[in-house]
Amino acid sequence: MHSTLIVARMNPGSSEEVARLFRDFDGTEMPHRMGTRRRQLFSYRNLYFHLQDFDADNGGELIEAAKTDPRFQRISDDLKPFIEAYDPATWRSPADALATRFYDWEGRR
């Protein structure tokens, strides 16, 4: 399984609404279209971490391809009051919010 981690800023007290928006979004076929197998949302000191797991190592590409879908655009718009780019001056697309993995370990079974 491969993962992407989106990092952004989140308004304090908005985690329940953000979770609701994703619960509704994940109830559609969009996660399947994007290749998302699991989504986890985290917050820490007004930072937002969005971990998505994919079967293949092309999650960032699939997210980029999905951004023209009206449902993707809708959730992006719905999240704007709660989530903002970590660095608005450099953000151009969802790919600009992806953290860079610099270490990976997986136990063998």
Walk through the language-model features, giving the residues of each.
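Short beta-strand segments enriched in hydrophobic/aromatic residues
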Residues: M10, D53-D55
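Active-site-flanking beta-strand signature of metal-NTP-handling nucleotidyl enzymes
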Residues: H2-R9
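Short, low-order "capping/linker" segments at domain edges
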Residues: A85-R109
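Hydrophobic residues embedded in beta-strands of well-ordered beta-sheets
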Residues: Y48-F49
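An amphipathic, aromatic/His-enriched active-site/gating alpha helix that lines ligand/cofactor pockets
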Residues: T28-R37, D55-S93
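Short amphipathic alpha-helical segments
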Residues: M10-R37
